[in-house]
């Protein structure tokens, strides 16, 4: 509104939607030991969307955050070794750019976050294998998992019920690409 008032052209019709990915720290140690926060960008040949890593936390924890009643996640990493975990976490964000007539990309992102909250009662967690098998993660499989999530309050669920297919397909492609790197 301020830009309109001042006659300044502006454009804000993009939103980043994604997940916080958590895995054993030793997997990323060859990178995070050299570069604390690696910035990796992937363009999906299938969806043509960009996906990027963001806010990498070696030996860190996933935490819940409440923003205007919407529960989302963030990651923290601490210098003090007594707060270190066995996991590294980072966001995988897919950028979506919208065209006319759609104008409210922020509301779209909030809608997806609200939908995830509705399905899980807060933060949702899903094992990658369950995501690929198109099945909801349950507490039993999560407890038997190779990676133990640092946010124990996260509710097992199925991200495919909350995230748009294009977003999820791009994230899955990037995870496979990272695995080959």
Descriptions of predicted regions:
Residues 1-181:
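Residues forming the flavin
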